[in-house]
UniProtKB/Swiss-Prot annotation:
This is Rhamnosyltransferase WbbL. Belongs to the glycosyltransferase 2 family. CDD domains: GT_2_like_c. Rhamnosyltransferase involved in lipopolysaccharide biosynthesis. The gene is wbbL. Pathway: Bacterial outer membrane biogenesis; lipopolysaccharide biosynthesis. It comes from Escherichia coli (strain K12). It comes from the Bacteria. Gene3D superfamilies: Spore Coat Polysaccharide Biosynthesis Protein SpsA, Chain A (3.90.550.10). GO terms for molecular function: hexosyltransferase activity. One of its GO terms (biological process) is lipopolysaccharide biosynthetic process.
Length: 264
């Protein structure tokens, strides 16, 4: 079973289209929509699907919201060790049949952690560079000061399944037991670097991330204002410092040192 988790920060229109594309009542997976804004419209949209779970209450960041949804799944459904969680952004476009084929492929390969090829347009001419190398301090400095991201992996030259360092949280398929084993997302972050941190801990725990280029989805990525005076920039800077500081102390023996609903 695959538990698909979608977090909404006011993304009613995107989620309506996504649920239509995925056939939200399909028996092969269970969709959980976590509403960060207690939207009546979103609740009404979700009520059209008998097999969908809608949960709300409280305003949190990316990682915290996803942890809440995973904890809900853990308590209500008691997933098997080999079940999966798919963290899916609301602005992803993927057809039902394509997702099922991808899931079956990953299961056949026994990949514990994987992602696919994301594009930013329906013509599939613009890549979303969602798989990257783990950043170091100099990478963040160059990115902030010059707008150049040296950690991007050139996906155009990858034609077969490849192990990569990390992938964006917009599309992550991870074995349920492995996610819980590393205590999920670190809730000490807010909106930035949660995905890098999670991928690092999974890597340290021996869980390899496979990039599967043969499967595609569309991601209408929205990039926040990164000017030095913006709130998004301050969040990003704070998360960067946290990642760089904690990278030095993390190991596969001390994941309990993160802030998570799985380890209060």
């Amino acid at each position: 079973m695959v538990y698909i988790i979608i977090v909404s920060h006011g993304h009613e229109d995107y989620i309506k289209k996504l649920l239509e594309n995925l056939n939200a009542d399909d028996e092969h997976y269970k969709i959980i929509v976590r509403d960060n804004k207690d939207s009546l419209l979103l609740k009404q949209i979700c009520q059209h699907y008998a097999g969908l779970d809608y949960i709300s209450g409280g305003v949190y960041g990316f990682g915290h919201n996803n942890n809440i949804a995973v904890a809900y799944v853990k308590e209500k459904y008691r997933p098997a060790d080999d079940d999966y969680i798919l963290f899916l952004n609301p602005d992803i476009i993927m057809k039902h049949d394509d997702l099922l084929t991808y899931i079956k492929y990953v299961e056949s390969k026994r990949y514990a952690f994987s992602t696919l090829c994301l594009f930013r347009d329906e013509a599939k001419s613009l890549h979303d560079y969602s798989v990257r190398k783990f950043p170091v301090l100099s990478d963040f400095i160059v990115s902030f000061m010059l707008g150049i991201n040296k950690t991007k992996i050139p996906k155009e030259s990858i034609y077969s399944d490849t192990v990569v360092d990390w992938c964006a949280g917009s599309f992550m398929l991870v074995r349920f037991s492995d996610f819980v084993r590393v205590n999920g997302f670190d809730q000490g972050y807010f909106m930035y670097c949660e995905d890098i941190d999670l991928c690092l801990r999974l890597s340290l725990a021996g869980v390899r991330l496979h990039y599967v280029p043969a499967f595609h989805a569309i991601h209408y990525a929205h990039h926040d204002n990164r000017s030095f005076f913006s709130k998004a920039f301050r969040w990003h800077l704070k998360s960067t410092f946290r990642y760089l500081a904690r990278k030095r102390i993390l190991s596969n023996r001390n994941f309990d040192r993160i802030s998570s609903v799985f380890h209060p």
